Amino acid sequence: MPGQMPVAPGTNPDQSFFDDLSGEVGDKGFLVTSTEDLFNWARTGSLWWMTFGLACCAVEMIHVNMPRYDMERFGVAPRASPRQSDVMIVAGTLCNKMAPALRRVYDQMSNPKYVISMGSCANGGGYYHYSYSVVRGCDRIVPVDIYVPGCPPTAEALLYGVMQLQRKIRRTGTIER
């Protein structure tokens, strides 16, 4: 459409979910749901993430919060404290000396907590895979929910990973993980 900025592929919210909600509210004038589903719906729109930027992928985390991509339009906002955050984004090479700190920060997060592993180094060690000091994937230290591939992944890839996490929360709920 003229006058609209082009939207990067994969950065629109789950349109079918919102169409179903608006259709039900439009037909009946109200929405019937369970408390658990209501909490899951609210949780997907208010994810507070904590950065665990270890290397060059952290620059893309900064990039995704700038006006061009504006991650806050999906209800995802950064927090400085692990006690206030629901999501941890691990970006970069995880060394053996940093692994206990990662676990400690993860343990300080409140439940339910989710982890996004961002980049080749966080996913499996990346370029430094065979080094004696590198953990071959942060999933050996903390449970990972979403893997975002790339070296470094683009801002669009991280946004897509966040949207996949929102879909996973809606699909599985908070009790099953």
UniProtKB/Swiss-Prot annotation:
A single GO molecular function term of this UniProt record: quinone binding
GO CC annotations on file: plasma membrane; respiratory chain complex I
InterPro entries in the record: NADH_UbQ_OxRdtase-like_20kDa (IPR006137), NADH_UQ_OxRdtase_20Kd_su (IPR006138)
Cofactor: [4Fe-4S] cluster
Signal peptide span: none
Gene Ontology biological process terms in this record: aerobic respiration; electron transport coupled proton transport
Top-level taxon: Bacteria
Keywords: 4Fe-4S, Cell inner membrane, Cell membrane, Iron, Iron-sulfur, Membrane, Metal-binding, NAD, Quinone, Translocase, Transport, Ubiquinone
Cofactor note: Binds 1 [4Fe-4S] cluster.
Protein role: NDH-1 shuttles electrons from NADH, via FMN and iron-sulfur (Fe-S) centers, to quinones in the respiratory chain. Couples the redox reaction to proton translocation (for every two electrons transferred, four hydrogen ions are translocated across the cytoplasmic membrane), and thus conserves the redox energy in a proton gradient.
PANTHER family recorded: NADH DEHYDROGENASE (PTHR11995), NADH DEHYDROGENASE [UBIQUINONE] IRON-SULFUR PROTEIN 7, MITOCHONDRIAL (PTHR11995:SF14)
Protein name: NADH-quinone oxidoreductase subunit B
